[in-house]
Amino acid sequence: MAPPRKRGRGSFRGSSRGARKPGNARGGRNSFQTSRIDEKREIESSDEENQFNGFEDDVSGDDEPVQDEEIVDSSSEDEEATTERPYNSLLQLLNANSETKHARKRRKLDRAGSKSQDIRDVEIQASKEVEEQDVLENQEASEEEDNAEADKAGESEDEDEDASDPFETHIASLDEAETTKRVNEIKSDKWRSIKSSLPENFRLIYNIPDGEGGSWSMPSAVKTTRSLKLKKKLVSRAAEILPSFEGVAQNIASLVFNYSDVLFAGRTPSNAAQMRDLLSLHSLNHVLKTRDRVIKNNARLSRDTNEDIEVRDQGFTRPKVLVILPTRQACVRFVESISKIYQPEQQENRKRFMDEYHAEDNESWASKPDDFRDLFGGNDDDMFRIGLKFTRKTIKYYSQFYNSDIILASPLGLRTIMDKEDEKKRDHDFLSSIEIAIVDHSDGLLMQNWEHVEYICEHLNLQPKEAHGCDFSRVRTWYLDDRARYIRQTIVLTSFLTPEINSLFSQHMQNIAGKSKILPQYNGAITEVALPITVKQTFSRFDSTFALKDPDLRFKYFTTAILPALARSVTGKGEGNGAGTLIFIPSYLDFVRVRNFFATSSQATNISFGAISEYTEQSEMSRARSHFMNGRLSVLLYTERAHHFRRYNIRGVKHIIFYGLPENPIFFREIVQYLGQDPGVLAGTAGAENLDVRAVFSKYDAFKLERIVGTQRAGNMLKEKGGDTFRFV
């Protein structure tokens, strides 16, 4: 759980945080008092939480009352027919026919206890209960606004089709024979890899479907947006916002605009804004080309009514771009990027959007690391979903999904409407025609619940269960042939690569235009540790032959090779004893296992310990930290997710044991620097000499190890046959 915030702290927060713990939602109870703590009862007394415990209809998670829309509590059809309420009066002024019908639908959805409120302005703020229904209420796409603008579009938006435009070659005018060939190669897992070095110490792995060894070449790097095939409307603004691409961004821009799948594992707070602008430009370019093509063909068909013209320019449903983000503030940043590029004359419901999604940064977090503020700054609520619709001059926020061009959502927010308990209400057809899927800040999503991301990816580009007003005569053939997943472009940005994200690359990136993995060369987090003294760091490798057995073998190694020495040193006297030992445990399940062992095993009888996990109460966290700093606790168990959400500076640390390496290399540096938090220890030469770090790893920790010790060292440490212990000073 992240530190409390002024906004965005809804009841869904805990529901999105990774695998469910096998016990109660709160761990570490009274852990600071004794080694025989009550936490064992906590684990044994409750079954595993339901994965969707806490899912409600409340969307924004705010405690603030809805002020801009009257919510009618209706108990009968007669009450629903009433038209004298202020809400209906306002709607009648705007649009007496269509909007009143919509209001009636909304009242039927709102009868579960909603309270009336006064109307304050024209931007009607929907209730949180209504929002979940509204995004799917109208399941037929509306072309009326687009058709009304067809003549206007001809004046400035009509552009000649460019055969060299990747939009034409990959989306609009696919070669069916070549597409069939590449799809078959992908199904047969026939990929050819091209590797190369990129600027800024990155390396590229470019995979292409190629079963016959044909000639392929990687897209050339681009230095400015002038080299991109953009809509005329976007050209000048793109040049202002993205005047040039430097370093690895030149290659990323080229791959993105050529519709290749991209996994970029070098996202940082410093390059996040440029990546966001680049992806916003690409998304807008794709949406505008798609919609303008439809509008132009609508006008053509209306003029040439006597000709038998076949037009294939659509998918099953309207949404074409899906953006998965970790927080509402991240959504605000992405939408702001879209808005500044598009420059609409009007933005409908923007005030409501900013009220519900934006929040100022917490001033008390000024000392927090940049990556922490980048993820949790502003409104860090992880339960949201919103649709954007584009017309020639307007961006419409909160458009219903089947009338939206771009959908932005958190994994939890999207899954709650896709996976309802009532099977009749389950719906994912709005994802059937997604052509660009963007997953930003994937490493942040890992600390929520990655299963939601996998679930969404599994439901992309499936054949729809209903027609939703689709004109099948205009659906592109590769949709009808169930090949959309091979055309869809997937773009994933992450700060580091993990097995889960790598699995996404392997299983869900199946693009006929190829897929690229851009990885950094690491010098190692151990080279970035800032301590005024030299600390001995020991890495111990244990043999693990099978991934599923890795947790058991790790636990066995810890209890037989590390814990006995720790138990002896804790009872010892002098500077070299084991008091002040922090045990960092990445997995919550491993944390529970180790905690229970400390509480029940005779081997740990004389060890006083505390435990801090992501589920520990705030008061218990503070108490455990205080007692550990004062020496009343010899050992403190600490999880990676607790550090992710809190970023504590823990005092009193003299020895560090990494039960497993952290996913985030920044965490390794921060944890090791705990050794420099106690001036009293650093002042004494004997005390400083006894500070040490020990880390345990196996071959399945290859990604983690590379980030911590460096790319070259990691390879040697994993392959070394002369020994399993490696020391760094």
Curated annotation (Swiss-Prot):
Q: Which domain of life is it from?
A: Eukaryota
Gene Ontology CC entries for this record: nucleolus; small-subunit processome
Quote the biased-composition stretches of kind Acidic residues, using this chain's numbering.
45-81, 131-148, 156-165
In terms of InterPro entries, this protein maps to: P-loop_NTPase, UTP25, UTP25_C, UTP25_NTPase-like
Q: Where is the composition biased (Basic and acidic residues)?
A: 110-130
What's an example Gene Ontology biological process for this entry? maturation of SSU-rRNA from tricistronic rRNA transcript (SSU-rRNA, 5.8S rRNA, LSU-rRNA)
Name the Gene Ontology molecular function terms of this record.
rRNA binding; U3 snoRNA binding
The entry's localization annotation reads: Nucleus, Nucleolus
Q: Where is the composition biased (Polar residues)?
A: 85-98
The alphabetical list of record keywords is: Nucleus, Ribonucleoprotein, Ribosome biogenesis, rRNA processing
Q: Which Pfam families match?
A: Utp25_C, UTP25_NTPase-like
Task: Tell me, in one coarse class, where this protein mainly resides.
Answer: nucleus
> Could you tell me which residues belong to the region Disordered?
1-165
Where are stretches of biased composition, namely Basic residues? 1-10
Task: State what this protein does.
Answer: DEAD-box RNA helicase-like protein required for pre-18S rRNA processing, specifically at sites A0, A1, and A2.
Complex formation: Component of the ribosomal small subunit (SSU) processome composed of at least 40 protein subunits and snoRNA U3.
Q: What PANTHER family does this protein's entry cite? A: ORF PROTEIN-RELATED (PTHR12933), U3 SMALL NUCLEOLAR RNA-ASSOCIATED PROTEIN 25 HOMOLOG (PTHR12933:SF0)
Q: Which family does it belong to?
A: Belongs to the UTP25 family.
Protein name in UniProt: U3 small nucleolar RNA-associated protein 25
What is the source species?
Talaromyces stipitatus (strain ATCC 10500 / CBS 375.48 / QM 6759 / NRRL 1006) (Penicillium stipitatum)
The top of its lineage is: Eukaryota, Fungi, Dikarya, Ascomycota, Pezizomycotina
